[in-house]
């Protein structure tokens, strides 16, 4: 009889632990959401801006009563702009901190590195700014636990090529690309296709890698070509220096980029004068008169005493997007939240209205 009692107790304990692992924080007074962003390192501008937006959104949600009466608790870590660290932190957030979803990272490479962990643990990861085309679907199929709320590199690469052709009447372009990132390679590929399909010619394509600082050899080389624009698919750290050094060499043609240019560090590195005739695509405009945008700007300025940038807006939208799904989820676990995310339609955010499709 004693053996039977011990056996029953063991079975009950196993059942309790199994229930905890499946429901995460279903019985807690709070809802845990992971925050895995680039708070230091090369891409810290993106991460810190996104987290400011996330924290504003969560502050507002909690002040309004939380999600179905439960407050959100953010579990925040710095992935140091390193994909390997982002992966490690995702594992920690899901297996130790017991979150129901993870927000971030900001960059495509780091975000993609976390997706296998999400799939293994059946807990969704969501990014506001991972723009690489293969973030949510690739040749192997749909990545079911990965979500994003931003446009893709094919979209913005195409948009910038059309801008060069139609708005700047460019016929010849040079590409100086970050060959060390999926982001840079994807943008270059899509810009090239659209520009050439529109009758333009890529007269030169040069490459650099992240952390390069001296681009004078590349710029001296392209000065021997005739071109109307330069497209730089890369991040602000290198782009700012390329722009500064190009202007110093007397290259005054329009310089184009994508959302990776969106950082005050670009201005610090390049200087205000060098940024004349520089254009880049972005997710958000502070001039938008949409009431949702106007209210966000007012609230953001009240909290942080500064104007919001696009990554602030994307972080804000991302937190609200995931919170909305959690409010509709059948249970507080990763699988239920993932299903609710998939069912999102016509979500109106600061950066636009969006719905989740099968890809």
Predicted segments, located by residue:
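Extracytoplasmic "Venus flytrap"
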Residues: 34-53, 77-84, 106-107, 176-185, ...
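Segments of small-molecule ligand-sensing domains
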Residues: 302-312, 323-359
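Extracytoplasmic ligand/sensor domains, especially the bilobed periplasmic-binding protein
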Residues: 98-204, 254-277
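Short, low-complexity disordered leader/linker segments with a strong preference
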Residues: 1-32, 63
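Beta-alpha junction/loop-to-helix N-cap segments that form part of ligand/metal-binding clefts
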Residues: 23-28, 46-52, 64-137, 208-215, ...
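Extracellular/periplasmic periplasmic-binding protein-like sensory domains
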Residues: 243-316
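Short, surface-exposed alpha-helical segments at coil->helix boundaries
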Residues: 44-55, 158, 184-192, 290, ...
């Amino acid at each position: 009889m004693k053996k039977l009692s011990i056996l029953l107790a063991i079975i009950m304990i196993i059942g309790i632990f199994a229930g905890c692992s499946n429901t995460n924080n279903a019985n807690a007074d709070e809802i845990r959401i992971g925050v895995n962003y680039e708070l230091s390192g090369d891409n810290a501008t993106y991460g810190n801006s996104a987290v400011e937006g996330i924290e504003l959104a969560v502050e507002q949600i909690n002040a309004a009563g939380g999600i179905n009466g439960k407050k959100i608790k953010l579990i925040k870590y710095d992935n140091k702009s390193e994909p390997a660290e982002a992966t490690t932190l995702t594992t920690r957030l899901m297996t130790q901190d017991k979150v129901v979803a993870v927000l971030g990272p900001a960059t495509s490479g780091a975000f993609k590195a976390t997706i296998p962990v999400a799939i293994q643990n059946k807990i969704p990861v969501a990014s506001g700014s991972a723009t690489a085309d293969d973030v949510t679907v690739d040749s192997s199929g749909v990545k079911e636990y990965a979500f994003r709320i931003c446009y893709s590199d094919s979209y913005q690469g195409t948009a910038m090529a059309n801008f060069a052709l139609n708005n700047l009447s460019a016929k010849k372009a040079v590409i100086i690309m970050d060959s060390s990132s999926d982001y840079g390679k994807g943008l270059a590929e899509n810009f090239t296709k659209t520009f050439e399909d529109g009758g333009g010619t890529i007269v030169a394509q040069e490459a650099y890698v992240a952390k390069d600082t001296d681009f004078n050899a590349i710029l001296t080389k392209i000065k021997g070509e005739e071109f109307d624009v330069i497209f730089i698919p890369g991040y602000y750290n290198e782009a700012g220096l390329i722009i500064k050094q190009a202007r110093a060499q007397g290259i005054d043609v329009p310089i184009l980029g994508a959302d990776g240019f969106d950082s005050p560090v670009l201005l610090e590195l390049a200087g205000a004068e060098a940024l004349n005739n520089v254009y880049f695509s972005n997710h958000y405009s502070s001039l938008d008169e949409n009431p949702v945008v106007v209210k966000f700007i007012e609230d953001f300025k009240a909290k942080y005493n500064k104007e919001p940038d696009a990554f602030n807006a994307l972080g804000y939208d991302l937190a609200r997007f995931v919170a909305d799904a959690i409010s509709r989820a059948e249970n507080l676990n990763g699988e239920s939240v993932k299903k609710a995310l998939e069912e999102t339609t016509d979500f109106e955010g600061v950066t636009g209205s969006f719905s989740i499709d099968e890809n």
